[in-house]
A protein has these predicted regions:
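Asp-based, Mg2+/Mn2+-dependent phosphohydrolase catalytic module
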Residues: 1-3, 103, 115, 119-225
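Short helix-capping segments at alpha-helix termini
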Residues: 28-32, 73-80, 107, 131-135, ...
Length: 225
């Protein structure tokens, strides 16, 4: 069955989650990389734990809480950076090949969208900053159903809105756990494995693995292979 839509995860896939700390690396000091990793890991952990417990807080609130935890774990990083880091995260830099990849897919007549844990305001800020809006048909946020990926209800936002079958969607994510959830739902998934990480969740394998977004338009799954 031919692919009709390419749907992208946002954070880590289109937008660089470490760009905020990278911008202030000199000020953050020796613990900058560890600080950024903790911030990201705690952001995800809080989302998963809330969903598992049947509760919800929007992703921006969790991003703030996770940042505070990173400061607590890395006391050498100056807390005075907090406002600047949050401002940067609100308008995260896109990866260099993100815009061209979306443009190439749109040129093939495919629908394109974002499906993200991010809150609507976060996503709007990032999309506007990266100037991706013209190449997106939709931006879906979990905020509408108040539950986080990898729950199946999140992926159903796409099929319901576009009135298409799961197997007509190519879902693109750099997060292997997200690829697992989307594969379980029925999407045909592409894992963007920039860091050449070893695979996991073998029973929920992606149909393709790429190192960069600009490889997407040439994939044979576009023609339904």
């Amino acid at each position: 069955m031919p692919i009709r839509a390419f749907v992208f995860d946002a954070y880590g896939t289109l937008f660089d989650v470490h760009a905020a700390v990278a911008r202030y690396r000199a000020t953050a000091g020796a613990e900058a990389d560890r600080f950024s990793e903790i911030w990201r890991l705690k952001q995800l952990e809080y989302a998963w734990m809330l969903s598992a417990a049947g509760h919800y807080q929007d992703f921006w609130t969790l991003t703030e809480h996770a940042l505070d935890r990173a400061f607590a774990r890395c006391p050498s990083v100056d807390r005075a950076l907090r406002p600047a880091l949050l401002d940067c995260y609100f308008k995260l830099d896109a990866f260099a090949d993100a815009r061209a990849a979306l443009t190439a897919l749109k040129a093939k007549g495919l629908k394109t969208a974002i499906l993200s844990n991010g809150s609507p305001k976060m996503l709007a800020g990032a999309v506007e900053n990266a100037k991706l809006g013209a190449d997106l048909d939709a931006v879906f946020s979990v905020d509408t159903i108040r539950i986080y990926k990898p729950r199946a209800e999140v992926y159903a936002l796409v099929t319901d809105a576009f009135a298409i079958k799961a197997e007509e969607v190519a879902f693109v994510s750099s997060n292997r756990w997200d690829v697992m959830g989307a594969t379980a739902f029925g999407f045909r998934c592409v894992w963007v494995n920039r860091a050449n990480m070893p695979d996991e969740y073998p029973e929920f394998a992606p149909v393709k693995v790429v190192r960069e977004l600009n490889a997407l338009a040439a994939l044979d799954l576009i023609g339904g292979a």
